[in-house]
Amino acid sequence: MQFDTIELAIEALRNGDSIIVVDDEDRENEGDLVAVTEWMDDNTINFMAKEGRGLICAPIDKSIAERLKLQSMEQNNTDIYGTHFTVSIDHYKTCLLYTSDAADE
């Protein structure tokens, strides 16, 4: 499998393209679909939801999660890498990303 350079990946993001970021085989051994929110639209979200088949995540600072009262997904995080997630949210008034269905409400 061929991988592009970090520089090419950054350029693709700057151009509004989505990329796949893969981690090490000894970690989670998975790929994440990544896009810049300013370039995202309904098609991007639908592609991530249907083809990615996982959570659609938006990185936020801990202070933002606290201000929005977003609880931790797990009270006792035992992940060896300390990966942290808040509880899932799916509401157009509180979510950074939304589908056209939510936008219509």
Predicted regions and their residues:
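A short linear-motif detector with a strong N-terminal bias
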Residues: 12-15, 34-38, 63-68, 88
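Glycine-rich, N-terminal phosphate-binding loop and its surrounding beta-alpha-beta segment
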Residues: 43-97
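A generic short-segment signal for beta-strand/edge and adjacent turn/coil regions
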Residues: 1-5, 23-28, 52-58
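N-terminal glycine-rich anion-binding loops that anchor highly charged ligand groups
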Residues: 16-37
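Phosphate-interacting basic helix/loop segments used at nucleotide- and nucleic-acid interfaces
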Residues: 1-17
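A very general structural signal that marks isolated residues within well-ordered alpha-helical segments
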Residues: 27, 104-105
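Conserved small/polar residues in nucleotide/adenosyl-binding loops
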Residues: 98-103
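Charged, alpha-helix-enriched surfaces in structured cytosolic catalytic cores
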Residues: 4, 40-43
